[in-house]
């Protein structure tokens, strides 16, 4: 494994998500970084996109047997930082270790309109014990 501390932080996230690895997809900057590690990937002469977060695509419903996702995240040193006014609020799941700015965000497909019939925004939902942001086109992953 790479000695880069960012990879160690990412590994803690993956460890937390182990029971659901068949149901989740790593997207965004970390997907590009991981692709470079594949034996068939072409070596590139520039550094990969660096982000402080890992984006995790979740299905709208996830099978949970045993601990929920948040409990496993907390056991691996992550803590929820709630943002915004939505219900549930959007969240960054940050590592609590000093000096490590790494965090995870969860994203779920937006089904229907961004605003419901009664005027309530459909921006977030609770999935498997974590707050997930609803976004268009996540389902194509």
Please describe what each predicted stretch is.
Residues 1-141:
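Compositionally biased terminal segments of proteins
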